[in-house]
């Protein structure tokens, strides 16, 4: 359990009240409006969805992919073992073996290269989630102890008249929370742009080969 989990219950209670007030309309001309148009969600609902994001599954995914890399390394080691034979068939086999080795583990466009990039992307996303959760927790801590929180609680009591003060306080809290989430999602989009070239599907890289000769002698050494 991290700081965001600990603040989830009081934070969602406050933001639920904020959502209730904003559902009746945010103050005209308030700086919240651009955020609402961009995010298309009220702060309570946005935080509730974000709470489901945790770094551990992404970290675990990175470890799992790296275990696959070790399997590819073992396969490549077997393919690289010299074969004691010669002749046209041996030459054709060596060319096919070299092409397969290139496809499996030669450079960032190989299968191993793509797996390593996938693991790195999972790690980067895990760091993003961890950092974003901490930043959001700090924002929630700030709004929970703010004067606006007191106003929102008073405006949403049974029988209370929300009034302009309640709507303004709710909008101020929403700006802080949605602003943090907007920056967080910008970070996720930046990560995707940075990693996308390294995550593209790898394709078989043909190597030009000469014509095979048939009918020659194949010699197998001991």
Go through each PLM region and give its residues.
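Short amphipathic helix-turn modules centered on a small-residue break
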Residues: 27-38, 43-44, 50, 63-101
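Intrinsically disordered, low-complexity Pro/Gly/Thr/Ser/Ala-rich repeat tracts
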Residues: 1-45, 106-117, 121-222
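Short amphipathic alpha-helical segments at helix-loop
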Residues: 50-53, 57, 103
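Short, charge/polar-rich alpha-helical segments
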Residues: 55-64, 124
């Amino acid at each position: 359990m991290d700081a965001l989990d600990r603040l989830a219950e009081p934070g969602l209670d406050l933001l639920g009240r904020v959502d209730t007030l904003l559902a009746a309309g945010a103050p005209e001309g308030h700086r919240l409006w651009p955020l609402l148009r961009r995010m298309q969600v009220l702060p309570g609902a946005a935080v509730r969805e974000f709470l489901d994001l945790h770094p551990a599954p992404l970290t675990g995914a990175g470890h799992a992919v790296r275990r696959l890399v070790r399997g590819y390394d073992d396969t490549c080691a077997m393919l690289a073992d010299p074969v004691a034979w010669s002749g046209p068939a041996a030459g054709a086999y060596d060319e096919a073996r070299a092409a397969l080795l290139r496809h499996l583990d030669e450079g960032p466009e190989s299968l191993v290269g793509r797996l390593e990039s996938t693991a790195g992307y999972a790690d980067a996303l895990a760091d993003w989630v961890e950092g974003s959760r901490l930043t959001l927790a700090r924002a929630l801590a700030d709004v929970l102890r703010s004067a606006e929180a007191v106003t929102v609680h008073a405006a949403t009591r049974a029988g209370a008249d929300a009034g302009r003060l309640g709507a303004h306080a709710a909008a101020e809290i929403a700006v802080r929370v949605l602003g943090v989430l907007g920056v967080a999602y910008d970070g996720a989009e930046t990560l995707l742009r940075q990693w996308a070239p390294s995550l593209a599907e790898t394709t078989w890289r043909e190597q030009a080969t000469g014509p095979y000769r048939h009918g020659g002698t194949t010699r197998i050494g001991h």
